[in-house]
Amino acid sequence: GAQSVNVRADPETIRQSIVASATERGTPIAQNQPNMVVLERTVTEANPALDAEFGPSDNGERKFRIRVRFQGTRCDTLVVQDVFVVNNAGTGLEQVFALTQPQYNPRQSLIGLKAKAESAGGCA
């Protein structure tokens, strides 16, 4: 399911931190809005576990879609991250499934975002 963390930074600092990290890693940004950033990463390797649970993605690419939402005030922002698998991305047969397994939505990515945003956020 969703992972969440409270960050001592404002939403704009969090948005900038997500965008900077994605750019550094070469992760495509699908949406960049004031209170939400959506990242997409193409799954290039075979993944039998995803095939077994969600069916094959044989009419288009399979992607992980990472949605990070954030809302709050200058030094208190709640960040919520959800991860989805998208079969046949960008086709008429596109299917989106929420991933609930913790290995697909690791908490350490949110902890890294928290550290980066708080170091830039100017809050004590």
PLM region descriptions:
Residues 1-124:
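Ser/Thr-rich, low-complexity intrinsically disordered terminal regions
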